[in-house]
Structure formats: C-alpha cells, structure tokens
UniProtKB/Swiss-Prot annotation:
Interacts with get3. This is Protein get1. It comes from Aspergillus clavatus (strain ATCC 1007 / CBS 513.65 / DSM 816 / NCTC 3887 / NRRL 1 / QM 1276 / 107). One of its GO terms (biological process) is tail-anchored membrane protein insertion into ER membrane. Keywords: Coiled coil, Endoplasmic reticulum, Membrane, Transmembrane, Transmembrane helix, Transport. GO terms for molecular function: protein-membrane adaptor activity. Required for the post-translational delivery of tail-anchored (TA) proteins to the endoplasmic reticulum. Acts as a membrane receptor for soluble get3, which recognizes and selectively binds the transmembrane domain of TA proteins in the cytosol. Residues 1-4, 132-155 are lumenal. It holds the Pfam family CHD5. It is a multi-pass membrane protein. InterPro entries: Get1, Get1_fungi, Helix_hairpin_bin_sf. Residues 25-110, 173-200 are cytoplasmic. GO terms for cellular component: endoplasmic reticulum membrane; GET complex.
Length: 200
C-alpha cells in the first residue's frame, strides 16, 4: 500500500496531467481505443465510415452524370445515393448517442479517479497526520498552520500537503517546460551555424 504522502502526490500528478492534456483530448483518445475493441459500437463505426465513403462516391458519380442526357443512369445513382445516405444518417445518429453515453461515463470515471479521490482523501484522513514535524523546530503558530484544520499539532495535515503537492508539481512543470524551450532554441541556433560552416 502506498503511503499517504505518495498517494496524494500521485493524485495531484494525475490531476495535472489531465488538466494539461485536456479532457476532450483524453475523451477522444479513449473513444478511438474503444472503437478498436470487438464491440457492436466498433462495428457500427466501421459501417458508418464505409457508408460515408459510398455516399461521397455516389455523389461524385451523380455530379459527373448528366441528368438530362443519361437520366436513367442518373436516377439509379440518385436512388442508391439516397438509400446509402439514409442508412448513414441512421447509423450516425446511433453512434452519436453511444458516444455521448461513453463521454459521460469517461467524465464520471475521470472525476472520481482524480478530484473525487482528492476530496475523499481530504475528508477521510482529515485527522491523520501526513508526517510529523521535528519537535521544537518551528514556532507554535507555524505548527498550528501546518496542521490546519484537524491534524494533531506538530504534524502536516492532508489539506496542507495537498496544497504543497499541487504547487510543487505546477512549479516543476514550468521549470521543465522552460528548460525544454531553451534546449530547443539552442539546438535551432546551432543548426544554421553548422550549415554555414559546411558551405564555407
């Protein structure tokens, strides 16, 4: 079992990653993975894309066929086009409904596994110290603030540790992003200089 310190830290890492990547990006990726599974929804999605290609192809053929000169051929294409389009719209409507249900389930699972878990930990472990502070190292008021609201005095509370983890992860991510931008800038600056030396 992970200690409370690491559990809270990993919950905040997960929250940060979800917020950084974006919920809609995660939803789209999970929907694409779900469509790879052998389910009826995946079968409907494949059928939908096949019908879409067929509708586009028939529409192209109708546009290339003169409705006055080749009316019989054009009318036959039109009937096939209308039938395929109706099938496509029916499957598309069912697929849209299934995607909405899937998105709802993913949003609930995502909330429960990140923010919901964070709130649960705050209430369940509100009187539990995350770790104890060395005796006499901090003034009484600082010990009280670090144990706020319900942890024993002389320890760090779950609420304070939550704030520390969230802030530390955000700061470390900013530092990492700045270092990455700087390294890319240096690499880009070296590339033109190296090309200039080769041409000389």
């Amino acid at each position: 079992m992970l200690s409370l310190i690491l559990t809270i830290f990993f919950v905040h890492v997960a929250i940060y990653l979800v917020n950084t990547a974006g919920a809609s990006t995660i939803d789209t990726a999970l929907w694409a993975l779900y469509l790879k599974l052998p389910t009826s929804t995946a079968k409907n999605a494949r059928e939908q894309s096949r019908l879409k290609r067929e509708v586009v192809q028939l529409n192209r053929e109708m546009n290339n066929t003169s409705s006055q000169d080749e009316f019989a051929k054009w009318a036959k294409l039109r009937r096939r086009h209308d039938k395929a389009k109706d099938e496509y719209e029916t499957i598309n409507q069912a697929l849209t409904s299934q995607k909405t249900s899937f998105d709802w389930a993913v949003k609930i699972a995502r909330w429960l596994s990140t923010s919901g878990l964070k709130i649960f930990l705050q209430f369940y472990y509100s009187k539990t110290p995350v770790f104890a502070l060395p005796a006499g190292w901090f003034p009484s008021i600082v010990e009280w603030m670090l144990s706020f609201p319900r942890a024993p005095r002389g320890s760090v509370s779950v609420q304070v540790w939550n704030s520390v983890c969230a802030t530390a992860i955000a700061v470390m991510a900013e530092i990492f992003a700045a270092m990455l931008v700087r390294m890319r800038g240096q690499a880009a600056a070296r590339t033109p200089a190296a090309k200039a030396q080769k041409t000389q």
